[in-house]
Amino acid sequence: MEERTFSRPAASATVLVGTQFGDEGKGKLVDYLSDQYDIVVRYQGGANAGHTICFDGKTVVLHLIPSGIFNKDCICVIGNGVVIDPNALMEEIQKVEELGYDVKGRLFISHNAHLIMPYHKRLDSLSESCLSGDQKIGTTGRGIGPSYEDKFARHGIRVVDLLNPKVLEEKLRDNIEAKNKLICKVYEKEEIDVDAIIGEYEAFDKVIDPYVTNTQLYLNRQIKAGKTVLLEGAQGCLLDVDHGTYPFVTSSNPTSGGACTGSGVAPNHIGKVIGVCKAYMTRVGNGDFPTELEDETGEKLGEIGHEFGATTGRKRRCGWLDLVALRYSLTISGVTELALTKLDVLDTFEEIKVCTSYMLDGKEIFDFPTEHQTLCRVQPVYKSLKGWMASNANAKSFAEMHPNAQAYVNFLEEATGVPVTFISVGPGRDETVFK
């Protein structure tokens, strides 16, 4: 009998994930790479994530629209895995158009994406306010979690419902009746006006209709036609609801697996996974952070790196790079190459530390424990590296970078087994080195 093998389709999609707690600089990378891809897709999260892009002397923060929108030849898609606040989306579309970029014909929104309603935001704030101290998650209050709750409870409202006023009104009345019972009887707060919300959301139909399509079919047909796709994640792997530092996580899957379920692109189309890693670490909100620096060094990292949340403006907690956590993220997302960002923030440090393992109850461990009860007890073990005390902003190649900066990058590669291909040495598009 003739031996046969199954052929594998040519992979034409790339996934880009954050490998830490979010805020790794994914926006700059997507903006830089978007001219190499025909389509950029946002596949999870909502307006709780902010991607910052610096170009032409401007700094722009996007929360929902993919960062590729500033490449005029790029098509942008908001996938089915995203939860959409229509008000925030309309404001963002207006912002992009005011900057001189066309959105119509270049932005498509999944008809299956779920909507964030006013009652989701209300419940988000009420739920968080009832928690105390270490129990607080540090939610952005944007209604993300409650919207995903409704999605998985199978009574969420989707974009497609905006296109049918009768269906929309029926679903809103049913949902708000249930939410008002919770708001009034459990939280003892004033109920929500259902008629006001119905009027507001019916008006979104005319505005959003030109952008709505079946993006699952659209993306797969475009891939079949030879188009290339970049799938852009929000937040980071360590905030993944299944694989992150639960319960201090987001409500979706920022890992590479979420790219397929959140876009409808099949796994066999994924050719590579780019992991974005900051040269140090930050975290917004509560949750375990083994390498956090609550001293002058942490303050210095925050000041130089301008570490304030793009969505909430909250001050980020700062610390040294954690290789234990990073290796875990690379494993669960199958990262094939690393993009190292904000290396320039370390330019004025004589000594740079990197966590290589943890001490737990007197034993050295190398695997990342995701459960809070264990992670809160680990102590980082550091390796010290020499700083470079110089700027690499003018370097046009890896060889032109300071030798100690090169050594830092090489150490990161050796410690993770993953090549670093992109190095950000400043916020601008041109302050980038490829290795």
Swiss-Prot record:
It is found in: Cytoplasm. It is an enzyme of class 6 (ligase). GO terms for biological process: 'de novo' AMP biosynthetic process; IMP metabolic process. Binds 1 Mg(2+) ion per subunit. Mg(2+) binds at residues 23, 50. The keyword Magnesium applies. Its EC number is 6.3.4.4. InterPro entries: Adenylosuccin_syn_GTP-bd, Adenylosuccin_syn_Lys_AS, Adenylosuccinate_synth_dom1, Adenylosuccinate_synth_dom2, Adenylosuccinate_synth_dom3, Adenylosuccinate_synthetase, P-loop_NTPase. IMP binds at residues 23-26, 48-51, 140, 154, 235, 250, 314. The active site is at residues 23, 51. GTP binds at residues 22-28, 50-52, 316, 342-344, 424-426. GO terms for molecular function: adenylosuccinate synthase activity; GTP binding; magnesium ion binding. Substrate binds at residues 310-316. Its cofactor is Mg(2+). Plays an important role in the de novo pathway of purine nucleotide biosynthesis. Catalyzes the first committed step in the biosynthesis of AMP from IMP. NCBIfam families: PRK01117.1, purA. Homodimer. This is Adenylosuccinate synthetase.
